[in-house]
Amino acid sequence: MTLTIYNTLTRRQEPLETVEPGKVKMYCCGVTVYDYCHLGHARSYIVWDTIRRYLIWRGFGVKYIQNFTDIDDKILNRAKEQGLTMAEVSNRFIDAYFADIRRLNVLDADEYPRVTEHIPEIHQLIQILEEKGLAYAVGGDVYYRVERFPSYGKLSGRELEQMQAGASGRVDAEDSEPKKQHPFDFALWKAAKPGEPAWDSPWGAGRPGWHIECSAMIRSKLGATIDIHGGGGDLIFPHHENEIAQSEAAMNQPLARYWTHNGMVMVNGQKMSKSLGNFITIRELLDGVGSWKEDPVNPMAVRLFVLQAHYRKPLDFTEEAIATAENSWKTLKEGLLFGYQYGEKLGWGQESAIIPELATRFQELGDDDFNFSGGLAVLFELAKELRREGNILVHEGTTKTPSDELQRQWNTLVTLAKILGLEAKLDDETQTQAGLSDTDIEALIEQRQAARKNKNFSESDRIRNELQAQGVTLIDSPQGTRWHRS
């Protein structure tokens, strides 16, 4: 089987052929650290974490780099608002990033370079561009000459002439800067402003522009050409377009073989924004505070919610969708905990074999542009089967499926789920899909049987309805009452 990836640059799905066989150099644009991470960040970093995990499972050695932008106007504005230094704001929200994203079971990147730690590398790259005639200095600022890069616009599918004509004077403040030779020239270095942090440079004191930062850090950490460059679809233009222009003009090599972009997160069909009052941070969602007025959401349910849709498609966050993800996680969790609950009783040993046919199905889906939403179907088949067998074991003391086959099913489920970052904690063992333990359910059934014996049918119906509302179905027979989780 061949692993194929959709490449934004070529607009087609292509076989993964890395610069160095068996190894993947991967970079994803990180956060600008001036606020807490929101649902859009959650999706991006869950997606790239899962892609990384999958590549490792497929046998690749992966080096994954994700930066922190720790110098930016938004950071400076936040620092002024709160009477803090830029570094204090950056460090605070870098710590918050790790606290939030690790709760979603996102593995740490191999390195997290910071812009402020790579000023010399940024200077060097700008100087290369200047020597090649692709950059020019004006009054302490340095700009990139977009007209000198013939393929500018190739990632976003735009042509410079069309962009210029379409602008019709509606360019932003930076674009309209009179010192620029072309409206779409962009800043590589910005002259210092009073009261703002600045670094010495060959062009005078100042700080780097946004786009040059990633180009310099990629070159420093991964070399001239990487295999996969990831990021949100909103970064295609201008950020990733400008990265290509800088890096490829300087190095005369492709910056990345594959450009991959995840889709946007919508909230109730609308773009998430503070002005619309639908801006939700990761910690608000997980803790049930702030903008999220409902109960706290299980981190694994958030991860499952993200993975249920193909990574390139838009994802609409609604209360109904997250509730469905919560219920789906409870089902999956029951399957993942099956071995911990019943393995000893079933006499399981240390065997870790998995079912090859199911692993092959999962891989075929993953190899098709990381179709993890399809791969989830394999997991749920196993989880539901294990849940049924668990219910039978509780009621009858044995299982219909042979013990060794159940162990292979469970091993397969745990192995494949871990590739997607879906893991159940041992302290979740007594929890069930309905939020009731087996003992709780059995106790309610005994109360119902007593009510029926006393002809208190309204109480009997109440208990049945209560259990049904929590996902437990009762089956009455002459031999007694059986139950299963629906």
Curated annotation (Swiss-Prot):
Entry GO terms, CC: cytosol
Q: Where does ATP bind?
A: K274
Recorded GO MF terms:
ATP binding; cysteine-tRNA ligase activity; zinc ion binding
The alphabetical list of record keywords is: Aminoacyl-tRNA synthetase, ATP-binding, Cytoplasm, Ligase, Metal-binding, Nucleotide-binding, Protein biosynthesis, Zinc
Q: What is the lineage of its organism?
A: Bacteria, Bacillati, Cyanobacteriota, Cyanophyceae, Nostocales
Native species: Nostoc sp. (strain PCC 7120 / SAG 25.82 / UTEX 2576)
Q: What is its EC number?
A: 6.1.1.16
Give start-end ranges for motif 'KMSKS' region. 271-275
What's a GO biological-process term for it? cysteinyl-tRNA aminoacylation
Q: What is this protein called?
A: Cysteine--tRNA ligase
